[in-house]
Amino acid sequence: MKKIILLTIVLTFMSLHVYGQLKFEEKDKIFDGKTFTNWVVPENNIWWKIDSKGILSAISDSTKTGSTLWSEEKYNDFAIRLEFKMIDGIVDSGIFMRGESSENVQIQIGISGSLKRDMTASPYVPKKGYPIEALKDHTDLLKQKDWNSLEVHAIANHYYVWLNGLAVLDYSLKNANLIGPVGLQLHPGKTMNIQFKNMFLKTL
């Protein structure tokens, strides 16, 4: 009986990542479109703003300080889905998956500062760079100056990414940190404006 249950669990995860994305519900919202509930607002916040349409904007300040908006909670296995739009400047952003050390993956949004080209949906590992380019065979998938959907699953040390409904990444990081917060990045040293909306997070 135990073997049957285990096999069912394994097949469930296999089908999840063969057939695609999860269904998120209202209760899974991590951003309510009105407040910073569920998030740790940086001290003297001048970067993160919410407008009347429920859109979260991250805008560089004049000194290009940069900022990260962290979730209050820490997560083990989880899935996050959001929509983003690159508004202005050289956008270098992303989602920190369980922290920002060399044991953590960041899913890139926009231009890589080191590679000087767009690496959206690709994993970035601090001190190691980009081990794989997610959109190498899907260069027309990313919509410039329009809304894009991004869904990321972190299951143990495995990371799965969908951009605009298409599976583009299946990556594993050896010795990955398996618990930590989620962060939205406004990269320092850049002049940029990026927007987010419809953000959901579900523990797995």
Q: What residue spans do the PLM features occupy?
A:
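Bacterial Sec-dependent N-terminal signal peptides
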Residues: 1-22
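Carbohydrate-interacting regions of secretory-pathway proteins
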Residues: 20-204
